[in-house]
Amino acid sequence: MSGNTGERPFADIITSIRYWVIHSITIPSLFIAGWLFVSTGLAYDVFGSPRPNEYFTENRQEVPLITGRFNSLEQIDEFTKSF
């Protein structure tokens, strides 16, 4: 026999008008906020990832792969010199 937690059943929540009034505003707002966050370039600045036109510079057109197991620090230093 299971106990009652006192919470409303999920079916009652999603069929209520109040739920849809609140979520018809918040869900599109979150979508628009996420779209603006990415389209303005703020996501690149916040997370520090390079913008699409910054992956390859004029000096370095190849993919920066670490190929050596024991000299990886030197390879990373070479890659970061171009930044």
From Swiss-Prot:
Pfam families in the cross-refs: Cytochrom_B559, Cytochrom_B559a
Subcellular location: Plastid, Chloroplast thylakoid membrane
Superkingdom in the source lineage: Eukaryota
First-listed, main subcellular location of the protein, grouped into a coarse class: plastid
One GO-annotated biological process of the protein: photosynthetic electron transport chain
Keyword Lipid metabolism: no
Cofactor note: With its partner (PsbF) binds heme. PSII binds additional chlorophylls, carotenoids and specific lipids.
Transmembrane segment boundaries: 21-35
Residues holding heme: H23
Gene Ontology terms: cellular component: chloroplast thylakoid membrane; photosystem II reaction center
GO MF, one example: iron ion binding
Keywords annotated in UniProt: Chloroplast, Electron transport, Heme, Iron, Membrane, Metal-binding, Photosynthesis, Photosystem II, Plastid, Thylakoid, Transmembrane, Transmembrane helix, Transport
Entries under Gene3D superfamilies matching the protein: Photosystem II cytochrome b559, alpha subunit
Cofactor(s) the protein needs: heme b
Topological type in the membrane: Single-pass membrane protein
UniProt xrefs under NCBIfam families: cyt_b559_alpha
Quaternary assembly: Heterodimer of an alpha subunit and a beta subunit. PSII is composed of 1 copy each of membrane proteins PsbA, PsbB, PsbC, PsbD, PsbE, PsbF, PsbH, PsbI, PsbJ, PsbK, PsbL, PsbM, PsbT, PsbX, PsbY, PsbZ, Psb30/Ycf12, at least 3 peripheral proteins of the oxygen-evolving complex and a large number of cofactors. It forms dimeric complexes.
Family: Belongs to the PsbE/PsbF family.
Biological role stated in the UniProt entry: This b-type cytochrome is tightly associated with the reaction center of photosystem II (PSII). PSII is a light-driven water:plastoquinone oxidoreductase that uses light energy to abstract electrons from H(2)O, generating O(2) and a proton gradient subsequently used for ATP formation. It consists of a core antenna complex that captures photons, and an electron transfer chain that converts photonic excitation into a charge separation.
Protein name per the record: Cytochrome b559 subunit alpha
Native species: Marchantia polymorpha
Gene: psbE
